[in-house]
Every structure is written in structure tokens, then in C-alpha cells.
Amino acid sequence: MESDKSMACLNRILMNKMMFVEDKISTLKMVADYYQKEVKYDFDAVESPREAPVFRCTCRFLGYTIMTQGIGKKNPKQEAARQMLLLLSGDVETNPGPVQSRPVYYRYNDPRYTRLEKAIERRDDKIKTLIKELRRQIKNRKIYSQGMFDKLTKQISDGIKDGVGSEQMNGNLTRICDFLENTLPGLQANIQATVIDTTDKYVSLKEDIMKIVLVILLVRLLMVWKKYRASLCVILIFIFKFYGFDQKLIDLIMDLKNKIFSQGALEDTVEEVVYHPWFHTCGKIIFAVMAFLTIKKIPGKQDWDSYITRLDRIPKSIEGAKKITDYCSEYFNIANDQIKMMVLGKTKEELQRANGLYGEIQAWAQEVRQYLELDQRNKIDLDTETANRVEQLWIKGLKFKSEPLLSKEMSALVHTTLLPAKQLYEYVSCSPVKGGGPRMRPICLWLVGESGVGKTEMVYPLCIDVLREMGMIKKDDFHHQVYGRQVETEFWDGYKGQKIVIYDDAFQKKDDKTAANPEIFEVIRSCNTFPQHLHMAALHDKNTFSAAELLLYTTNDYNVKLESITFPDAFFNRMGDMAYKVSPKKEYGIETEKGNSGKTYLKLDKSKLDKTKAIDLSVYEFQKIVRDEKSDAGWIDSGSPLDYEDFAKLVCSKWKEAKQSSMNKLKFLEEYAIRAQVGSEENSEYGDCIDFVDDIAKRLQKGETLEEIEFDYASDPEMFTQYYHFKSTIKPASRWQKYKDRMDICLSDCKTYLAKKYEEIKKILAEHPILTILGMIGVALSALAMYYWFSKSLDPVEAEVAPSGDAKTVRLPRKLVEIGASGDVKTQKIVKPVVETEWHRNNKGEIEISCDECGMHRMSAFNNMTDEEFDNCTYEDLNKDQKRELAQWSTKDSWLGRFFLSRDRKNKVGIWAEVGQSGDVKTNKAQIKRVEAGAEELVTVALTQGCSDDAAHNLMIDVFQKNTYRMSYFRGDKRYQLGNCTFVRGWSFIMPYHFVQAVFARRLPPNTIISLSQQMSEDLMQIPLSHFFSAGVDNFYLTDNCVRLPFKNGDFRDCVMVNLHSRMCTPHRDLVRHFILTSDQGKLKGSFSGAMATFHVNNMGLYRVYNWLNAVRPCDKKIEIFHPEDGFEYPEESYIQRDCYEYNAPTRTGDCGSIIGLYNKYLERKIIGMHIAGNDAEEHGYACPLTQECLETAFSALVNKNKKNISSQFYYEIPNMVDPLGDSSVPEGKFYALGKSSIRVGQAVNSSIIPSRIYGKLSVPTMKPALLKPTILNNKVHNPLLSGLKKCGVDTAVLSDDEVLSASQDVCRVMLNQYNKNLNKTKYQRILTYEEAIRGTQDDEFMCAINRTTSPGFPYAQMKRNAPGKQQWMGFGEEFDFTSNYALALRKDVEQLIEDCASGKISNVIFVDTLKDERRDIAKVNVGKTRVFSAGPQHFVVAFRQYFLPFAAWLMHNRISNEVAVGTNVYSSDWERIAKRLKTKGSHVIAGDFGNFDGSLVAQILWAIFWEIFVVWLKQFIDIENSEGKRILCICLGLWSHLVHSVHIYEDNVYMWTHSQPSGNPFTVIINCLYNSIIMRLSWIRVMEKFQPRLKSMKWFNEYVALITYGDDNVLNIDAKVVEWFNQINISEVMTEMRHEYTDEAKTGDIVKSRKLEDIFFLKRKFRFSPELQRHVAPLKIEVIYEMLNWSRRSIDPDEILMSNIETAFREVVYHGKEEYDKLRSAVLALKVPQELPENPQILTYNQYLHDIEYLADPLYDF
């Protein structure tokens, strides 16, 4: 019997009830192989009366027997196999019914068409049915977690054979489907195109060859006949024809003709043609051609050589041609002027003056005529810009009037137009917009504050902010748009309509009844809507009105005493509306006594200001005050204080409201005035009757009065009736009508004049035919020749409709502009604000459009359609106006938009087609068949849709892009993809919990590496599986680094948070603030558009993908999510998830873990959850909901699990000067790009090291200065900086937590022991003050002052300073500066850094990568190896010394005994102590040399140093459980983070290291020593685990090994009992496993297990016992001593450095013994003075040097 599990797998294989001919037998064979059974077939011939043979097949399998018969060509074996499969699958229905097929088309009853169509149908149906059925078999109808686990079934479990065959078959069928659907049609089309193209080329080539042969024969004949010119002409004609120049010429002429006709050029006047710039250019070309032709006629030989020779003489070929062209251009200009004078009838002077003036005059007159209309004049009262333009018309007219040489007609036009232009000018002067009517009530802003708070200083920035709101944004507007009013001067001299008036120190004059303060009453007049007529001293400035819109008063006292006005509230009502008390913030103020009153006030302390800012606006705060007569002060505070930014926004908002209110009132008054009139100006009270006008005028002239005339008219009833009608209808001609009539006459005369000139020109051209022909031909030829020059600017853009692959029609590359959102920063489109409009039906049923933002209100273009037409119309039925309205104004939220969308969804008609993908579900891009149309131009322009939410889009392409990773792991050599994870804060990321379940189901070993990758950065982070969970037999348990996220009811979400702190993981930016709040979830009603950032994998590697999500909506029901059917055993087949988000999206396997963001500009926070599942069949996706509250709860849970998880609260923030969207270039390796800096750093390119005067005299140089700039090496540009940085981005090892913990705890024990009994431990268990961190404690040699001569770091080094190094901020010489502005600014930066670290913010510390200017071996310099030094910023150095320097001093005071040699004086007895320690375990010693030590540092060990060593030290004097202790721990953690994951800059590229520590930090050597001790203990553990597991603990390491470290140098003394295993060879091997290069220090090439103490070097010094001193001494390498004499440094006197080096060399060579001393002494004394040495050096005797060493009697020995 087969197992139930096997039968279930078989049933899944046999679910498909229909198999095809090709697969029947093979499928049954596969089933048989699965059951390890055989299928037996028996064939028998059956007697049949038919002519065709009949066979019977008997199929036996698993006890079943099937018999089938086959006739003729039918295969009974296949039929038997099919029926056997049907029997096994339980299908008893052998006839499923008829199959629907395509109907046959009618083709004129021709049987051939019928047979052809049937054959095509059979072929198509066969392919379609095959593809359809194959896809149906493998189609998945359940919801699966998309974590890429369903692709792992084929290779993993040998014991589980269930479903292997089916999965292989499904995979093959999938590939067949993809091939049939994609590859095959393309191959067929390409083959057909290739064949056709090849055939065409062959035919074309054949024709071309025939043509060439014929031309060659013809030319040969002409040459035989000696017709050389004719043969040359034939060749030229053939070339012209062969390359299609003839057709091109015809096309150019036709295009030019079409464009001329289309542009209406024939309607241009002759004058316009004459003045056209092309006419000028064409004429020059014609004259040049004529000149060249004339040159050819110079007497002489006519052959080409002679022609070129002669052309060379007039003068020098090309130069001569250029000069001739210039001369011809001058002559043409003269001729052109003569033609103009002849055509226009002007003299030369008139032509020069009137050149182009007539057109300007006519345009000016037409513009004046335009503003005479009533509707245009009304605009003057509403629009300042229109008023200014009308004013300029009068000024321009005066300019035209001054022209003395205008024609009579033009002069008449100017004089006629001047009077109405003047009247318009006067109308503008009296217009309300110029101050003569109702005006805007100005905003009265009253700023009150004590003297010295800085009121005046912040006034101009405030004015600039208000002017910007007014639209005056030029940089100098604040100069002339702000008027300073001094009331004591009485007059407003200099006022030119400024919008802002400032009363500085207002109301200083006492107000008295007899001597009133004019400011008081001016406040009442100014703060009003009535026109304020200003008192001006100059006569021409009279009639000036105030146009101020903001009145700004500053004063010291808000209790203004009023005596001269009867109603004081009129003053306070105006001033109290915007009254604010100004004061500095507390942190920027200083308490100052107010006179002798005993009261104090806060005065601005200028020493606390930011010296980098000219005006620091952040120091002010503004408190609103309101009038309250009940209070003692008369005023009380209202609301909370505002900072400057909020205050400026408030003032601008108030101005905007007042401005809008003023415009509304003015508009109302104008409308009210119109309604008050009896009729319009055109329908006034009088009619037109010339008889009554003449009669009345004559009788009035005779002396009759109007009353007498009317009395006479009344005596005749019929006449009075006519007079009454005349009086009722006629109106007297207004002055504007007179102006219009007169100007119409003048314009008519002008047109008549121009027409007359046009006829004269025609007559002249007719009388001069030669000139006419020359001009026309010249223009035609010139236009043809220049057409090609202008074609690029004239031709419309042509584009290929779709890419065809044809090189002739390929689309040219263009600058890209992003229409939708692709995620690429380089093509990101700036989104313009969207104007929201509203469609609604009024009471009459008409559609109206209204927009509150722009004030638009009008009827819709759809009102001309009936209801039936409106309901049934399609987009093609709309007219031009309706389409424009629909495209420009209808949004998805408008009534009209919703109507069309809902109706067209039912009718399946798409109105909107999205050009790019914006994420809007209603505008998804329609799929369109693409057809190549040759050179067809794109006529229809698609309306594009911009990004609906710019904030969400920037979040996607910036933060999501850098915080999202793809997770994967290796099994063997194959990589398996898991899914996505996203870092939400610092080192903490979230991922679906089913990832953990799936990994556990695969039974991966704990040391399996989970890799986190991004596009172009694979395996950027590597974490062992043991970091996530510990596995049991049937279950697993999350470690302290992970926590699940629960719902409120206790159920868990499909989400787990993981903290990767202490791993090779960089801190990330904070995403938590972008997640929605729980209170926001209630707002997510309906459906939204969204997006998610994910990764896909293809043959090219990993690449980022943005999926746009449609109809994102809450899903309140529970959903069942199935684990993939991948052959692994899960704890459960499925799990339930409730309260999800559902959306429509083509998600795919591997998208799980992607963050879901909404595109909704009204939603402040955009992230709502994480993708956890999808349904491939229905294209539905599901997301786990996430909020800020649940994430914060998870962070707290992590901290409760383990105190080290306090690191989960930390995050990185990009500094302000860094643009995260900038295209940053990072060195090769594993680095994390951050962006581009606005501040660029430079590099030193010239070395300060120079050869000395005795270079090469004493020894052959073995070193030279390192390269400091890019250099060409081996024909390639070598950048030494990037080459050196590449070493810091190498892969590092992933170590076991247990072994690292064991080693680090043992190192902690050694380091914290007190070996120096003279030390007071409490002196070092404290935090230094700021002053101590800079100048030192002054009582400890290892807590000395900071080095102030070195670089201050970034960005201080880029600031302007007057002293080198850090002295600008810390002082010079013996004095330390703590009070200057620079010193205070530095202190502020240090305090801010410490505060940031305390709050969990890692930011604003950037190390500068620079090349180290030093001597290196010549071989290394020749290959470009230069060491890189990373200088830290000084504010970080100070802060780090505050918290870590005492611990470093403790280690140095206990040196040597604690394995650390830092602080050792190599000239003192310290070297003897080191030698003794290295002999305690015997004579076996090794001294290894690390290669690329800094670049190989493992972040795991660096964090172990912090947590297992330093924090243990910190706990001895700080209680980290209370708030203050927790704060100090956070500060230290933040400062340490700046080292382990340091941020660097080179040029302007900012990036982060994933591990290592920068060489320029103040703790470099100490960290390297501690690291060295830990890594050597790890080597012991691994070596002993291989050879002697019994001895792997730290007890035996300390028993058998004595270690000394100094940075990356170390020496080990190993006991003889273990040296067989723990030696140089084995240590190097295990170091390689840990990604460290550790070789023999001697570099002799001989591999030895150990050496003797006297054979090794430590710090480039040997161990030599001195019989004279009776102790071990430290002789420097002899070659180093001699090499130092070959070099000096650039300085004022390089010889002084040389003499100092000679003295040092003798003090060093003494340690080598008397023989080496004598050798050096003889060599130096042999040098000539002054040729080789500047002076005779001082050389002591050998014994004197020994004496100095014994007593350390030289500054050199003060190490």
C-alpha cells in the first residue's frame, strides 16, 4: 500500500482531466515511475470489415485494465494511456461536450478560402488551446505568502519525493508557455523581416552595380572622345542622383513652400519683407556668389589649378573669400538702404530714424484705442499692473511726438492719440488703484520691547517675507519698497508708493493738549480705508496718496499716554489688533536690570548668537498682547509665544486676508455703482438727432435760452413728441467716444497711407524687372540654402510611434522628463499644485464650474447637450471645448469626473489614459497596440498626469530606496531569495513573521548567513541565522534581538521586528514618523492609491521595482494565508490574519515585506503597512497594518528583553548640508551612499617631503614621498585615494556570538584590573568637563591637552580662519580660549552633539578622507599605494574625550601588564618590562603583521569592546538604571556609533562605512589594542577547537600565552607545551577564516612556527640586551636611521630639519652598539661643509649618549 501522503500528491498530479497527444504516454510513464511500477501494453489485430486496419491495446497498471481500439493512423497506445489517467483521477465522463470554435468567415463562396481558413483555425486553436490548458494546470487558486519559498522544492530534500515529478512538469510547461507566447512570435517576425530586408538589399545592390557600370562606360566613352568636361558633369550628376540630392532639394523646396503658405507669408506687406532678417542674409549670399563668379572671369588660364592659384592671390584662398564676403556684405547693405529709400520715399536720415518706428507707433495707437473701451478702462481700477501699463502709454507717446522726421500721416496719428493717452494717464492718477479712491486698510503691526532686545534688527527680514508674499521677489525690492517715516519732518518726501512704512521708535514724543504728537493722529488717518492724502514739500509731488499696506511700529512702551484726542480707543483699536511683545529666547538672553527700578528684563546676549549668521532670527520670540484696562499693566498676554518663522507666517496671512477683503469690497462698490445707473454708457438718456442739435445750437447762438426753445417746441404737439423722443434717446458724445471716433479716422488714414505705399512699391518693382527678378531669385536661393540651417528650429519634433528595431527609424535620444513616477531622481518631475474645482447642477439643471482658489465661476461646456446625449456620449462625441474642460478641470474627486468614471466603467469605455504611472487607480495606463508608422509625426498630444502626492513620491524614491533590502541566503553555491525587509529606525527592521517560519521549515543550520542586498550592492550586510531564533526539534524560539508585533487583543500580526545592532549593519534613517497613527486609521475610508518598493531578480542581478497599488482599502474580515506547497513541513498549513489592507496589484513571489505607502496629499503620514500575501490569479495583495504606536511598543519590548536593545531607539539623520537625492559616487566596496554635500573638500596634491642636502650620500634611498594625486600608471589613471579607500569596503567575517563573548569578557577582566598600585581609581571613573576635554586635567600626563595644531575637521576646515589647526576655536600658545565667539560656537556644537546622542540621533559627524603625506617604500609608491587618513571634526573629538579619555588614561597607566603597550616610552625601562613579559612563557615568540587591519575590523568585535568592556567600566561608577545613567549610556553609545559606522566625505561625496573605525579618531590606538587582544583569543579558540578542544577556554590561553599589543602590532610569547598547535602557521590559517590577513612580521618568505625574542621587531624596533645599561633596549631598524637622513620637509629652513635628524640618528644608532655608532660618525664627518652640510653637527661621544639614555637627559626621550 502507498502512504496517504503519496496518494495526495498523486491526486494533485492527476487533477487535470484532459491530456494531449504529446503528453499521454509520458505522463503515465511519470506516474508509473513515481509508484515504482510498470505499465504494460498488449497489442492485438482485430477483424474488421473496414479497409483500414484496426488494433486493440490492453493497458495494465496498478491492477487496472483498459482496452482501446485504434483505426488507421490513430494510436491505440496513446488512447489507452489517456483513459488510464482518467480512470486513476476518478473521471468517468469521457465526453465533456462540444468545444466552442471560431465561426468561418464568408469569402465569396470560394472553397479555397474555406480550406485555408480552416487550416489556419486548426493551427491557431491548437496553439491557443495548448497554452490555455497548460496554464490552467499550473495556475494557483489560493492566497500564498510571497516569500520565494515555492521555488525551492526541486533540489532540497532527498527523502521527500512527493510532488517532484509534478513540479518538474509544471516548470517545463511554464517555460513552454512562455516560449510559445513570447519568443516564438518574435523569432518568426525577426526571421521574416531579416529575409525581406536581405532580399531588398540584394536587389538594391544589383541595381546600383548596373548603374555604376553604365556610368563608367559612359565616362570612358566621353574620355575617349576627349569630352573631359562632359565626363566630369556626368560624374557630378551621377553623384548628385546616387545620393538622392535631387529629391532632397525638391523636398526642401516643397517644405519651404508649404511653410511659407501655411504661415501666411504671402499676406505680408512688401515693407515687412524688406525688413525681414532673412532678406538681409540672403542678399549677402547672392552678392558673394556673384563675386565668386566674377572672379572666375579674370583673364588667364581656365583650368582648375590656375583658378585656385588666382583665388589664392585675392587674397590667400579662404581668407580672401572671407574678405570678399565682408566687402560684398557692406556693398549689399548700401544697396539695401537705397532700395528702402526708393521704395519708401525717404531720405537717408529719415530712413535711419524711422527704421522700424512705424510699426511701433501703430501698435501703440491700437493699444491706446483698446483702453478707451469701457470694459478695458474698468481693469485700470482693479489691476495695478494694468494701471502701470496705461501710464507708460502717455510717456511712450511723448517719445514718438519728439521724432522730427515722421511722415504726415504718422505724425497725425501720434498727435491724435496723444490726447486720449494723456486723459488715460490722468484717469490712472485719480484711480483708486493709485490711491485716489477707496484703499486697503493697512495692517498695523506694533512691536513692543525693551531697548537692546533687537527689534530693529529683525524688521527688515520681516519686511522681506511680507514683500515676498506680495509678489515682489527681486533681491533689491526691500530697498525701495520700504519707507522709513519720521513724523518730525512733517513731509513725506521720498515716498513713491512704498507698500511698507516703518515707524521706528514711535511715540517717543509726549502727547500734550497744547503740543500734540502728530504720530497719534497719523495712526488714525493711516489705519483707515479712506484715501490718505500725503503732505509733500515738492510741488510736483502733490496729489500723492498713501499706498501702504503694512504699517510697522516699534516702541519701548505699550502704555502710550494720549492727551490730544477725544476718544483714545480709536488709537488703541487700530494699534492693538496686531500688538506683539518682542524678547529674546531665554537661552539667548541675559537678565538685565531695568534702570533703578529693581526690575529686570531679558536682554539679547550677542555673544550667544551664531556667528556664522549675519542676522540670527531664531533667537526671537513674539508674545501677542491685548488691551485690558482692568490689569495694572494695561495689557495682558494672549496665547503662547511664537518663534520668528511662525510669526512671519502669521503676518503674511493677515496681510493676505486684508488684501482679499479689500479687493472684494472694491469689487462690490463697482458693481453697486453699475447697478445705480439708469443704463449703460451705450444706452444713456439721449438719442441721435442731428436736426434738433443743429436747431438748438443755432438758437442758443442767437441768444435764446433753452427754456425758451423748449417752450416753443411744446406749442406744437407733433414737434414736442419728436423732441421728447430726441431727448429720451440721444446722448451727448462722451469724451471717450470722441477719442474713439477720432482715432478710428486716423487709423483708417494710416491704413490708406500704407496701402498707397504698397501700390508704389508694386509700381517700382514692375518698372524695374531686372531688380525684381534678381531680388526674387536671390530670396529663393538664399531661403533654400539657409533652410537647412534653420530646419532644426523650424521643424516640429518627429518621433517614432513605436520602437521597431529598424536603425533607420530609431528614436533619437532626448533629455528625459518624467511624467509619472519611475523612482529615478534624475528625471523626477516637479509637481505643480493642483487646482481643485467643483461641478454641480444649479436650480435650472445646468452644470456650473466653480473654483474657490482662483475665484472662477462659469457655466460648463456640457450645457449644450441634452440629458440623453450627456448620458450616452463617448469621449469621441465631445467637441473641442468639452474635451478641453474635461482634461483641464475634471479631477477624480469632482462630480463630473465621478460621473464619467462610474458610467464608463459600466460601458467599459476609457476616458483618461495615463501617460506615466502616477499610482492613481482611475487613470491606469491603457494597453495599446504599437505600430510603426515610418516617419509619421505624432499629431495627437496625450494629456499627462503629474504625481498626485509629491511628499509620498519623495518618500518612495529617497527613504524607501535606502531603507529597503532584499533578503537571501545560500545553500551550497546557490542563492535563494526570501523577500524584502525595511529598516524603520536605526538598526531595527521589520519583515513578515512567516519568513522565520519558512526558514525554520527548511532546517537551515544556525550559522547560515542571511544576506541583505540592494541594487548594485549585493550582500551589504550579513547576519547569521542564529541572530533570529534558536531552533528546537519541532519548534523555534525568537532571540532577544527579535519581537513580534501584536494587535490590541493580543493576537500577533504577521510581522516581526529585528534589531541588528552589533552586526555589520549601518544605522538607517527614522521611518517611524512616516507611519500612520492609530487615530488616522479611522480616516482611511474608501479606496486610495498607493505604491510599494520591492526588488526583482533577473539574469542581470537585483534591481529595484516600484509597484503601483490600485484601490487600497481596509479589509475587516479575516483572511486565511497558506504557506507555499514547497515540500517542507510547516507547523500549520495556513494561518489567519485579520484587519488587513487589500489592494489590486500584480504582486509576485518575493514581494512580501515591502512597505505600503499611500498617495494622498491630504494624509500627513503615508505608510500604512507591509505586504504579506498575494493572490496571483486575482491580482490581489494583502498588507499587515502597522502604526506608530505598535512600532513604539515593539521597541519597548526589545529593550525589556535586553538592555543592549536600547540601541533600537537610535537612528541616523542626514546632515543639512547633504542632499540625499544627489548622485553620490562611493569608492569600490561595501559602502553606503548618503548623498552630495553642498560643501566640497579639497586634497593636498604636493608633498611637503623633499630630498635633503645629503640625499643619497650616506645610503641608497629606499623610500620616496607617497602619491597625493591621480597619476597615470600602466596607461591607466590611478587614483590613490579611491584605491586606498577600497580596502575599507572588503567583506568581513561573521563570528559566533559565544566565542566573541568569551574572548571579550576575558579581555575585560585583564583591562579592568589595577596593576599600578599608585593609581587612585576614582580619578579616572568620571566624566570630564568641557574645559578638561580641551586643555586636559593638568594633573595627569595621559589626560593632557588636545593637539590644537592639527586640522579642525569638517566643516571647520572649510571656514575662514586666522590661525592654523584648531587654534581659532581653542586659543593660541599657553592660553586656552573659552569665551570668544568662535569658542562659544564650538561649545554649542559639542553640546548639540551630546544632546543628539542622548536622544538617539546619530548625525553631523563627518570624517574627511585624505591621503597621508609620508615616505613609503619605492616599490609601493611605484604601484600607487598611499595610506588614507580620515580626520575627525573637532566637536566630536572634544565630546569623545569627555566620556572616553579617563578610561584610555586608565589603560595607559596600567600598560604592559594589561597587554596594552600604549603609553610605552621605548627609551625607558618600559622596554625592559615588555621583554620580561615576553619571556614569561618560554623562548617561543611570534610577531605577526596584519594586512589591511583597519579595513578588516569586524563590527561585531567593535561593539563587543563597547558593551563587554567599556560599559562594564561605566557601570562601576554610573547607575545606568536611573534616568541620568541611561542618558550617559545613550551618549556613549551614540559617540561610539560615530566610530563603528563612521560617515566620510571625499570631494563632495558623502557615504558611510559598514565597519572599521576611522584612523583620525582620538581612540584609534586604544580600540586597535583591545581588538587585537580579542582577535588573538578568538584565534586560540579556533586553533584549539581543531587540535586540542580541551584547551579552548580562556583559562588555558592565559596559562600558556603572554600577549603585548600596540595598535595593530602584537607579539606573543607561547609556552612550549602548546606551540605545536598554537603557532604562526596555524594562527595565520584561522585568521584567514576570519577574513584577516596575518603573516610573519619578518616577511622573509620562510614559514616558521616561532622565533626568538632577539629575532623579531616590535614597533620597528628590536629587543637587544645592552651590557652597558644592563637592560634591554629598543634599537630602531638601521635602514630607517639612515633613510631619515635622506629627507627633509618644506619649511623656512629645511637644513634645520636635516641637522635635527642627524642628532636624532646618533641617539638612535647608539642602541645598535659602538660599531654602528663609529660607522655613522665617520660617514657624517666625511661630508663637506658648507657644500653638503650647512654646518658642523654636534656629535657626542658614545659614552655621553649612553649617559643621556640612562638618565633620559634629552627631550627626545620624553616620549
Swiss-Prot record:
GO biological process, one term: symbiont-mediated suppression of host innate immune response
SUPFAM superfamilies from the UniProt entry: DNA/RNA polymerases (SSF56672), dsRNA-binding domain-like (SSF54768), Trypsin-like serine proteases (SSF50494)
UniProt PTM comment: Protein 1A might be expressed through a ribosomal skip from one codon to the next without formation of a peptide bond.
Keywords, alphabetical: ATP-binding, Coiled coil, Helicase, Host-virus interaction, Hydrolase, Inhibition of host innate immune response by virus, Nucleotide-binding, Nucleotidyltransferase, Protease, RNA-binding, RNA-directed RNA polymerase, Suppressor of RNA silencing, Thiol protease, Transferase, Viral immunoevasion, Viral RNA replication
Stretches assigned to the RdRp catalytic domain: 1483-1622
Domain DRBM: 23-90
GO cellular-component term (any): host cell cytosol
Recorded coiled-coil stretches: 113-140
Residue span(s) of domain SF3 helicase: 421-595
Entry keyword Plastid: no
PROSITE patterns in UniProt: DS_RBD, PCV_3C_PRO, RDRP_SSRNA_POS, SF3_HELICASE_2
GO terms of molecular function: ATP binding; cysteine-type endopeptidase activity; lncRNA binding; RNA helicase activity; RNA-directed RNA polymerase activity
Superkingdom, taxonomy of origin: Viruses
Active site: H994, D1054, C1152
Pfam families for this protein: Peptidase_C3G (PF12381), RdRP_1 (PF00680), RNA_helicase (PF00910)
SMART domains attached to this UniProt entry: DSRM
Catalytically driven reaction(s): RNA(n) + a ribonucleoside 5'-triphosphate = RNA(n+1) + diphosphate
Domain Peptidase C3 intervals: 950-1191
Binding site for ATP: G449, E450, S451, G452, V453, G454, K455, T456
Assigned EC number: 3.4.22.-, 2.7.7.48
Annotated site, Cleavage, chain positions: G97, P98, Q701, K702, E818, I819, L901, S902, Q1209, F1210
Function field: Protein 1A functions as a suppressor of RNA-mediated gene silencing, an antiviral defense mechanism of insect cells. Binds to long dsRNA and to a lesser extent, to siRNA.
Name by which UniProt lists this protein: Replicase polyprotein
Organism: Drosophila C virus (strain EB)
